[in-house]
Amino acid sequence: MRLLVVDRFAKEAKALRRDFEARFADPRRATADRFVWDLWHVAGQYTALRTPAWEFFQKKAYDAFHQRLVWWGRRTLGCHDVSPPWLSCYVNGCEQRLHGDLPHGPVAFVFSLTKWATRSFRGGQTLLLRDEVLDFWRGFVSTRAVEEPEVLDEVPARFNRLVAFDPRIPHGVRRVDGSMDPTEGRLVIHGWFVQPRPFIEGPLPEKALEGAIHRITGAIAPILEAGLPLAGLLSLGFTVTPAGKATRLRTLADTTRTPKEHAPGRRRLLSLVRKALETHVFPRRSSPSRVTLPLVFER
């Protein structure tokens, strides 16, 4: 997984947008709640207006959105929480040049409250360096032209869109050219999914996963000890039946990466992980349990 895009993510999006617009609708109004922005500027790298999202919005709508985001991260990524989210506004001249986020969290997110369909500005897309560039010479063809679409993936900040991506990949925000009015800028809530750990919905106790994790560790240890240079997050989802069998095993998110010459070893490791889970016997319970199991590899 390098990128996940979820449109129409949160029913709270319209309420959050209304809250923002109500505060900044009248530029001559000088109430205290308007004085919230940090102009974050690192020359040649970052320029944006930002403020803590949880302090900006009305509590009811924001709390509902925050819980939706957290639960999505648990069920989809196996990440227990999110970092304290920022609310950032990009007006004329704002941008983020290419950078990688280390070690903030295994998955970054950007949730857009931008009126993208009616925007008056240019730019504002999320940019990610393509994998072909990260290993540029391996697939190089001297007769093939290379222009920006072959170098960068571009993701529009559509309203109510959640974008989750591997933050190790160099990424940024295309420079915004247009209005200085915050209500006409690129508006996003962003941060990182953090604290990968097992998540269970159902009667299976978390302690019951210890045997499965031990089995997985034993299965993949020889490959890792042989020097497989693997790094990233592998999150698996499965259902444990009342009889204790793991079924409906699926990969929810996989940011594991190796140099290309080690790709067969990576595939072998992933196969061993699946086999270890499929053959493990869990304790019997009266009803099924839904499990998200994240595995973190570092080097």
Task: For the regions a language model picked out, list residue spans one by one.
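Non-heme Fe(II)/2-oxoglutarate
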Residues: 1-75, 201-219, 231, 241, ...
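Conserved hydrophobic/aromatic beta-strand scaffold that supports enzyme active sites
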Residues: 3-5, 87, 110, 154, ...
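Residue-level detector of conserved, well-ordered beta-strand and adjacent loop positions
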Residues: 7, 88, 174
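Phosphate/oxyanion-binding loops and surfaces in catalytic or ligand/nucleic-acid-binding neighborhoods
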Residues: 23-26, 116, 196
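Conserved double-stranded beta-helix
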Residues: 30-138, 168, 192, 202, ...
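Extracellular/periplasmic catalytic domains that process cell-envelope and extracellular macromolecules
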Residues: 102-105, 156, 182-183
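Double-stranded beta-helix
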Residues: 129-163
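Charge-biased low-complexity segments
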Residues: 144, 150-152, 161-162, 168, ...
